Amino acid sequence: MGVIKAVAVINGNNNVKGSLQFIQDSTGVTHVKGRITGLTPGLHGFHIHALGDTTNGCNSTGPHFNPLKKDHGAPFDTERHAGDLGNVVAGADGVAEVSVRDTQIPLSGQHSILGRAVVVHADQDDLGRTGHELSKTTGNAGARVRCGIIGLQASV
């Protein structure tokens, strides 16, 4: 398997915007890199959601991508949704530099994330570690601030 590339553009009617590149290497590891601006400083939940449907904004992107029907967790946990990518950190300037490597978000095969949404949340993802009622499903990460659809990128 060769290198596969995809992109997601994050934009909308608020100040949050950005661009993310997804690169799956020949070993099956996908690297997500890019920049998101306009965020409030601090940690923000960062997930792949099941659907690429934005007819109702980011609210129609469905739950976290979870083909193996597991509980929510941290990116390094065995028990986690495939789409659980943890948090991105926005500095005092509201900019988050994203760099995530993961084996559970392939760009090809049965559990491909192509056509699904990447979502940035308003609050910190608790990584399934608190007693909050939403901890094991959403990480209690709050509202969906902005999202983008992951689409195949031309290999030039």
From Swiss-Prot:
Cu cation binds at H47, H49, H64, H121. It comes from the Eukaryota. Binds 1 copper ion per subunit. GO terms for cellular component: cytoplasm. InterPro entries: SOD-like_Cu/Zn_dom_sf, SOD_Cu/Zn_/chaperone, SOD_Cu/Zn_BS, SOD_Cu_Zn_dom. It is an enzyme of class 1 (oxidoreductase). Destroys radicals which are normally produced within the cells and which are toxic to biological systems. This is Superoxide dismutase [Cu-Zn] 2. It comes from Mesembryanthemum crystallinum. The lineage of its organism: Eukaryota, Viridiplantae, Streptophyta, Embryophyta, Tracheophyta.
